[in-house]
């Protein structure tokens, strides 16, 4: 890495892009590992039913927490653009405003979560022990929801503040705490789903509070948390900018709930457990795409504000090349690791292992395509074009995935559910390419 600090105003080669975005990529991976570690310990130390319960209720928690990603991506794009225009005072005002607004939203959403948790679990078909385990896991996590929202938000804003390495440090600290506490609460104390939830909640508190302390004190970053004046226009622009990421996260969670309903119909609890393994691995693999998109977004927004369109075109071209290489590597890894990763989670049950390994082999084809749609949506957000970004996110999840998961099983039964994920990503890439070409022609 270069000894000279990388700045948003720099010219970015592929090497410099990797250097700048690597902390964001690692940061998002560690966040994804929270769920992966929970799943590993619950599955191997508590059994299939608690594991299925965790997988069943996680989409509800992700929907509530995704407001943090909306504020982080939407606000980060607006802050970076404002700094590119040279107005650092207004950039700091917007930064403080969105942090306070997101914290307030987190409190309100946590209260809402306690009201809807049981009805949502019942709606997805949970009953008996499956229902009780899901409620235990969900309620404990809801206590920490405001901190989860802040953690999600700061993952984006650290890059905007030109402090991606500090963001990585905070996320790694929270992730390590989660792993250690999971081993203690679930592996040693045998607290099951409750222990996994407590470990996650504590780690989210670490990830949310540490950035607050840093930005509230004098620091060497571009941003400082302090008093702010209400700016409804900036708040509205933040929400509209980040609406695509919010919609994408909410839609993916709703789609996961629909997948769970379909899997209960075609394969029962084993189907949900197999899908859970796929989602855990997918979160880590796709975290590379999400992390890159989060890391490069403030660069794109800055050069948009500075009206450096030549650099913007270069960033897009180099990003697509890097994503293509990464997609091929992840597909190859998915094919090779299908059996070992399935065995890691469900090796104790031969039937479930066979189902999961088979599903993984089909599902890994989605890695060839998913990164381009993720980046495409983020690219338009960085350009402050929230509408196009939202359309891509909406089509990718609520149209393509819902349509595929409802129709494909009619033709191919259980395999149709796994194939539907791949088909949806292919259609999303085609849609993204159309929007990018249209933007280039304009």
Tell where the protein language model's regions lie, with residue ranges:
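Short runs within selected transmembrane alpha-helices of multi-pass transporters and secretion channels
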Residues: 72, 140-159, 170-178, 196-209, ...
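Transmembrane helical elements of multi-pass membrane transporters/channels
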Residues: 19-38, 140, 174, 203-207, ...
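Hydrophobic alpha-helical transmembrane segments in multi-pass membrane proteins
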Residues: 24-32, 69, 101-110, 144-149, ...
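Short alpha-helical transmembrane segments in multi-pass integral membrane proteins
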Residues: 1-21, 79-144, 188-243, 300-366, ...
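N-terminal transmembrane alpha-helices
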Residues: 9-46, 59-74, 78, 103-110, ...
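Hydrophobic transmembrane alpha-helices of multi-pass small-molecule transporters
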Residues: 63, 178-183, 208-212, 283-287, ...
């Amino acid at each position: 890495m270069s000894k000279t600090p990388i700045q948003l105003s720099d010219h970015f080669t592929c090497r410099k892009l990797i250097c700048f975005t690597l902390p964001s990529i690692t940061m998002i991976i560690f966040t994804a590992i929270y769920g992966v570690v929970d799943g590993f310990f619950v599955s191997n130390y508590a059994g299939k039913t608690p594991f299925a319960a965790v997988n069943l209720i996680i989409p509800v928690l992700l929907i509530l927490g995704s407001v943090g990603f909306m504020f982080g991506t939407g606000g980060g794009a607006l802050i970076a653009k404002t700094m590119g225009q040279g107005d650092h005072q207004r950039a700091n005002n917007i930064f403080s405003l969105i942090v306070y607004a997101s914290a307030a939203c987190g409190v309100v959403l946590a209260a809402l979560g306690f009201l809807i948790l049981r009805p949502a679990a019942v709606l997805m078909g949970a009953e008996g022990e499956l229902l009780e385990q899901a409620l235990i896991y969900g309620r404990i996590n809801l206590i920490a929801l405001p901190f989860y929202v802040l953690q999600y938000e700061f993952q984006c804003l650290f890059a905007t503040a030109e402090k991606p390495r500090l963001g990585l440090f905070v996320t790694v600290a929270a992730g390590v705490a989660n792993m250690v506490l999971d081993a203690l609460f679930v592996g040693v104390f045998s607290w099951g789903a409750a222990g996994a939830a407590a470990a996650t909640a504590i780690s989210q508190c670490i990830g949310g509070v540490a950035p607050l302390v840093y930005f509230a004190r004098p620091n060497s970053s571009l941003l400082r948390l302090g008093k702010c004046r209400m700016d409804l226009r900036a708040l509205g622009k933040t929400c509209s900018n980040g609406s695509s990421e919010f919609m994408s996260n909410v839609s993916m969670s709703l789609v996961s709930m629909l997948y769970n309903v379909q899997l209960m119909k075609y394969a029962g609890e084993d189907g949900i457990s197999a899908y859970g393994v796929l989602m855990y691995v997918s979160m880590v693999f796709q975290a590379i795409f999400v992390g890159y998109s989060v890391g490069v977004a403030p660069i794109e927004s800055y050069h948009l504000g500075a009206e450096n369109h030549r650099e913007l075109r270069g960033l897009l071209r180099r990003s697509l090349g890097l994503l293509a290489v990464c997609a091929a590597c992840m597909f190859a890894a998915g094919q090779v690791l299908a059996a070992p990763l399935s065995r890691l989670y469900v090796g104790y049950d031969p039937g479930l292992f066979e189902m999961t390994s088979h599903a993984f082999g089909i599902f890994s084809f989605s890695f060839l395509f998913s990164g381009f749609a993720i980046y495409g949506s983020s690219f338009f957000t960085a350009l402050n074009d929230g509408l196009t970004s939202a359309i891509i996110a909406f089509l990718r999840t609520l149209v393509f995935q819902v349509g595929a998961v409802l129709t494909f099983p009619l033709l191919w039964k259980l395999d149709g559910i796994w194939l539907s994920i791949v088909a949806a990503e292919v259609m999303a890439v085609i849609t993204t390419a159309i929007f990018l070409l249209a933007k280039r022609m304009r």
